[in-house]
């Protein structure tokens, strides 16, 4: 700290201002039920696109919430947690992280490999660089927060052979693994090697498709086609920052 006195003088008021913003976001918060790739009628409380007149009453179903908004909020909540130690920021960040990762397309292709990628939102079929890249760094940060804490585990759902199963693993391992998987998807699907920048998205319109299994409804994979769109700078930036954080955590070049 080059100016410790300046920091000590102003940090409390900025921390208080951030907390006010955090509480105010509840006007964008709502609750709905979602049929995802591995969950039937799961209840989630993300932040919506539009502001409500009362806290917790925002409409958030379908296209009224998008995953990338949640990702950027997770990033700021984790930064605030590391600076303040406020547990509520970490808890909310993990709630939103679970919601975002529920959007990961874990359905399998003909070779038994995950399709991968996160759609723009639960009401969309397209997958975007902006709904994948921003989540890499915060997942690495979460992994570091729980590194060495063996008692902290998480249960998640997967499709190892086309059937839905649950598995319990350490949070540090799970978050780091998902960071690497999302990073690989982002790089493989959006990076233009000849230009060194990223496409915007892949896929387009169309309704979200569902299928039934054991009397329950789940989301189905949607074919995407070729990537395209304008190469917005922040989509390349999240790939770079994600790579830097992954390298710092793993040492893998």
Where are these regions (language model features)?
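Glycan-recognition and catalytic cores of secretory/periplasmic carbohydrate-active enzymes
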Residues: 1-253
């Amino acid at each position: 700290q080059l100016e410790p006195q300046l920091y000590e003088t102003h940090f409390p008021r900025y921390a208080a201002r951030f907390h006010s913003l955090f509480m105010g976001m509840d006007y964008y918060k709502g609750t709905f039920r979602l049929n995802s790739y591995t969950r039937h009628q799961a209840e989630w409380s993300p932040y919506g696109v539009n502001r409500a007149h009362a806290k917790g009453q925002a409409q958030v179903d379908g296209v009224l919430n998008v995953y990338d908004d949640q990702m950027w909020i997770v990033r700021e909540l984790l930064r605030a947690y590391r600076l303040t130690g406020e547990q509520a920021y970490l808890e909310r960040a993990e709630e939103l992280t679970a919601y975002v990762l529920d959007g990961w397309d874990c359905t399998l292709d003909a070779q038994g490999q995950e399709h991968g990628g996160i759609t723009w939102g639960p009401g969309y079929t397209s997958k975007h660089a902006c709904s994948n890249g921003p989540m890499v760094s915060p997942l690495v940060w979460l992994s570091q927060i729980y590194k060495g804490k063996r008692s902290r585990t998480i249960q998640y759902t997967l499709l190892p052979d086309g059937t839905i199963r649950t598995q319990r693993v350490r949070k540090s391992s799970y978050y780091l693994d998902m960071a690497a998987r999302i990073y690989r998807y982002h790089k493989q699907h959006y990076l233009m090697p000849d230009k060194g920048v990223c496409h915007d998205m892949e896929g387009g319109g169309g309704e979200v498709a569902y299928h039934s299994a054991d009397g329950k409804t789940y989301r189905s994979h949607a074919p995407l086609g070729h990537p395209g769109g304008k190469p917005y700078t922040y989509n390349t930036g999240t790939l770079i920052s994600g790579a830097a954080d992954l390298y710092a955590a793993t040492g893998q070049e």
